[in-house]
Amino acid sequence: YPSRKEKDVEIRLQLSHDSALYGIRVSAGCRLTKLRMKEGRDFEHFEPLYTQAVETRREWTAQGKGQDLPYRIETLENLPEKIYEVSALDTRLTLRYPLGEQAREWDEYDPCVYELTVRILRGGSVLCERTSHFGLREFTHDELKLYCNDKEIFLRGTHDGMSFPLTGYAPMDLDSWLRVYGTSREYGLNHYRYHTCCPPKAAFLAASYLGIYVQAELAFWGSIYEAGDENYDREQQEFLLQEGIRALDAFGDLPSYFGMSMGNELWGSKAEINRIMGVLKAHDDRHLYTQGSNNHQFVPSVLPNDDFFSGVRFSTHRLFRGSYAMCDAPLGFVQTQRPGAYWDYDEMISPARITGSESSKGGTIQIQYGTGIREVEVGEGEAEVIPHVPVVSHEIGQYEFTPDFHEIERYTGVLQPENMKIFRERMEEKGLLGYADEYFRASGKLAAACYKLELEAALRSANLSGFQLLDIKDFPGQGTALVGIMNAFQINKGAIARTDWRMFCSDAVLLPTLDSFVMRGGDCIRSEVKLRYYRPEGLTNVRLQAVWLLKKQAAGDMEHRKRRTERQPEEGQNARWQKSAADSDAGLCGTAVQARDCADVTGRGLLTLGTIALKVPECENNAVYTLRFSLTSDNA
């Protein structure tokens, strides 16, 4: 994780020849090279030279630190330098340069990044040189599905506000971003959504090397108005538009640049938001665009220029997130429904029918705005939304941990944990500080269980194309959001092991259904089992198995939980977390097994494996069982 080291900051003013390259745009999805040049004079020709492919196969240590970066550099064979004669009057050129059949496409499983160097020559001398990194990839959508190079993808993402407590600013070096993304990949993520900001080039480059889909966002959280409205701010909106163009020009070649959002939770003119989106889309159509993240929350619309929709609901009661704050009520299924493994959002996204009560009646409503409340106008007669573009759920999760006060000592940089100190003082005033570790552990177990319910519901939804967590790690800005399974330094808090988290957040997740987690001994249940699967290789000779396991409670276990330990933690585990017998599988014993053969897995997406019939074991007293589903195949 980026550390607070003193580094020299270099600021340069670079003079260039008047025959200079203004920018390079590589349209690699269709294997074309487009070069945009600053207007110049008196040059004869320039040469594009494809130099190398970068392949990123890397192993991460326990916390992703101190390792070498084992990139394998490959040079494409039989691709000579190519000379193009150019008129001095040409300022925009489109040149074709085929890479040949040996060139590989870029995606999360084969993140192959190419480097292009372009030089302007005159009389054998180099007047100007530019280098660009790119990948062969094309993002598209069809109805409710997202595709990369015609292969369906599902976004397993997280919000990121670029908060770095030790420095107060985002790192600009590649290695720091490789650690950030590499750690998140270990937790099954393949997507980052940046909240009202655009990360630096090093972030896009690291994401390209590691196969992360990045969504940048205009730096705005507010209302957009049309010209003529009394609230219209021409300078503000022109600034946002130019910032978007600059981001696209600077980073658009990098293959990780997946999406572009117009801002966070915008209100105001939908027509003007759509216009701004259209201008950016016309400027650079290599990415997918969305009007914003959770715009017009209670009265959303899918706009004509939307390539995908990011939000939390399509009307007051058509919710596709598991939990909500009271200011955004009604609450979600995690908060209101019986615990079980049965929920999905398909009917909420594409309902069989619409009732008249769902449309808006207009007027003024209160919304959350930053850390405060604001009133906004709602238009009358808003039509019910049936999306025709992919849907991504916005800022899901937000399950709080009680603070871990031992974390305070980690804040050795510019950001001071005054909020954590205040929380500690409050607990001490109430005589509860001695129980702080217990509160931390208990709240963590509850948060992990809630995240499991929420993510499995998202993966169980055929009509959903991705989710964006808030957050995989704590967010120490804009108040306090201790909602991550990792703290603000990307260190696991210990509530759930990385391997257990990946059981419900990865590119291959088993999704058995259970109507309830509370059953009677002897009951017969049927579980339909589905599989979210995106790995490039299929599965053959697939066998599904379900096992009932009785968890025996060890004597004195609760007392054992109270004792703190100073032992070294396991990899990625918070040092203050004491694992007890009840937290492990040590007391499990097999009591019943049910298995069945399944069809080979040859595709991607949400697949149905079949149904397993099970009988709940008889028991004299209340007992805690684990029902463990597993999938085996010849090539898993």
Annotate the PLM regions.
Residues 191-487:
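Substrate-binding/catalytic cleft of secreted carbohydrate-active enzymes
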